[in-house]
Amino acid sequence: IGTSLSGVTFVSVPGGVRHVAKAGALPNALGYFQVVIGYFLGYLVVAYVLLPLYYRLNLTSIYHYLQQRFGNWAYKTGASFFILSRSVGATARLYLVINILHIFILERMHIPFWVSVAVVLLMILLYTFEGGVRTIVYTDTLQTTLMVLGLIICVAYMLHEMNISVGEAVNQMQSAQLTRIFNTDPNSGGFFLKQIIGGMFITIAMTGLDQEMMQKNISVKNLADSQKNMLSFSVILVFVNLLFLLLGGLLYLYAMHEGAAFAVVNGEWGFYQNGLPVTGDNLFPSVALGLMHTVPPVISVVFIIALISALFPSADGALTALTSSFCIDILGLKNRIEWDEQKKRRVRLTVHLSMTLLF
């Protein structure tokens, strides 16, 4: 869950609920949930089509299937594309979260951006250096728990601050046109069939065919337990995403309660308070860190812990997966019978450090 829900999800999904592209247009509302439904269907395909295949072939790297099915060139190409795409994607998500922490907190402490990045990467490097996937399973469990707890605490605080129940919040969101899930306009890019089918294939490609996402599943003892893990994960993921969307609606209700409104400022259409943009990725940090209205310090601390907890599972998993894929798929470490264990270990550590520097 932590690997799937990165810092991008943590700030962008709530921030996108009230997003309006132009004056007079309908908000995105809960339209993202259409994609989440597609995710769920995709996980069923992964659990009952791809996982049995991986277990039958006893794969350490899922790209070995390409070698067995299509030959060495397809194998190396698939692994290379994974390394390229995961490097770009993971560093982009890492940058977003560190940038938010830097802009809202660290910059005021006069800490340079490169120092912030170096400290985060050093922490990830230290606890993945020895443990690999085994360490990540435990650390990701803790970090994901903190992230979800932070999400629940923030939702509870919003409800308490506005003195409303969950039912009343949903009614207010409905009045603000923030509860629409399904887009029935076939000409729209958000048409529900497009979103659901797109979400399904995103999951099949970005989970079922991704070494980072599958490394934990194929390390489970047997196929039945791995499928059970995948199915329970997919159900929980649906509810966690729904909670993120509810938080997004509450954040906009809270922002409007504090005087924010849609307007054109300097020729730019957006959601502003006192001339400052508080929409999209800026919304959650602006509320949680007290920039819109004074909040208890504990809420700011909870937000920071939850945001960091959202950052680490996606970054550490990517670092470990990139290391294992490069060593096994590109260097062919398992087949290097002329290398002793000490040399193989030295190569693994060198690749691990190199991937950290690449980040």
What are these language model-derived features?
Residues 1-13, 237, 241, 355-359:
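A generic, lipid-embedded transmembrane alpha helix
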Residues 12-37, 67, 112-113, 145-301:
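Loop-to-helix junctions at membrane interfaces in multi-pass transport proteins
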Residues 2, 29-129, 198-206, 309-316:
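Helix-loop-helix module between adjacent transmembrane segments
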Residues 1-11, 128-131, 144, 150:
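Membrane-interface "cap" regions at the ends of multi-pass membrane proteins
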